[in-house]
């Protein structure tokens, strides 16, 4: 793996191309997409992105659909809370 500087981190591979503000936006996105997330099934910190919107747990081998760059999205959280509220209203 190539040596990156402290300041630019994962976007050091782009060098001086594309402009500083775009590289900062890409850095935030790439850090979230390459990090590990907690698996909701087994509870381990092993959920990783396999492809765009596909998240795999390396411990329990579950595959779920999620966001493109982040496992949980704002829209998914909104839908989950709405469904929970409607379910409680029905009971």
Swiss-Prot record:
InterPro entries reported for this sequence: Ribosomal_eL37/eL43, Ribosomal_eL43, Ribosomal_protein_eL43, Ribosomal_zn-bd
Origin organism lineage: Eukaryota, Metazoa, Ecdysozoa, Nematoda, Chromadorea
Organism field: Ostertagia ostertagi
Zinc finger region(s), C4-type: 39-60
One Pfam family per UniProt: Ribosomal_L37ae
Name of the gene this protein is made from: rpl-37a
GO biological process: translation
Domain of life where this protein originates: Eukaryota
Family according to the record: Belongs to the eukaryotic ribosomal protein eL43 family.
Protein keywords: Metal-binding, Ribonucleoprotein, Ribosomal protein, Zinc, Zinc-finger
Protein name: Large ribosomal subunit protein eL43
GO molecular function, one term: structural constituent of ribosome
This protein's GO CC annotations: ribonucleoprotein complex; ribosome
